[in-house]
């Protein structure tokens, strides 16, 4: 059975360990100490978003994070699916689909107007999951401007 627990301060070390595994997939750099501080800030301030541990048969197998944004185009608060990670042994078992359904229900409870996300070009399994869950490709390009 798949269940979800709201992330707590006591979960930060486990979350960062999973985040390191997630980032390693695509070779993204990660500063574990900085990530721990960011998780602490995030968990303490519910206005920033929500994070959940994903459990399968009471074993933690991943996490999902929604970050909140106010958006005029969509009429209010929306969320970015900032991260959705499942351990390798949890993939392909329907847990991702259940997790998307869970965050859709949570989004309704939170009166969110829209969910959006990014997915790697090469991650066809994730793209298939998101498309089958009702997400569509957006006809705009994503750009960024990073501040140090």
Question: Where are these predicted regions, by residue range?
Answer:
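Conserved beta-strand-loop-alpha-helix junction that forms the acyl-donor binding cleft
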Residues: 113-126, 144-148
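Acetyl-CoA-dependent GNAT
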Residues: 6-10, 17-76, 106, 137-138, ...
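Residue-level recognition of the GNAT/N-acetyltransferase active site
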Residues: 69, 87, 91, 120
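Conserved GNAT acetyl-CoA-binding A-motif
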Residues: 100, 107-118
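Conserved acetyl-CoA binding element of GNAT-fold acetyltransferases
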Residues: 77-88
């Amino acid at each position: 059975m798949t269940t979800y627990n709201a992330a707590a301060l006591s979960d930060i070390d486990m979350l960062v360990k999973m985040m390191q595994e997630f980032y390693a997939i695509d070779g993204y750099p990660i500063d574990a100490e900085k990530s721990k501080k960011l998780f602490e800030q995030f968990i303490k301030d519910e206005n920033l978003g929500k994070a959940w541990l994903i459990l399968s048969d009471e074993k933690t197998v991943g996490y999902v994070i929604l970050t909140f944004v106010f958006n005029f185009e969509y009429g209010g608060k929306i969320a970015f699916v900032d991260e959705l990670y499942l351990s390798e042994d949890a993939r392909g078992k329907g847990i991702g689909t259940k997790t998307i359904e869970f965050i859709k229900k949570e989004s309704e409870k939170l009166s969110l107007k829209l969910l959006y996300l990014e997915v790697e070009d090469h991650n066809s399994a994730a793209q298939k999951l998101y498309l089958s869950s009702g997400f569509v490709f957006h006809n705009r390009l994503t750009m960024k401007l990073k501040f140090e």
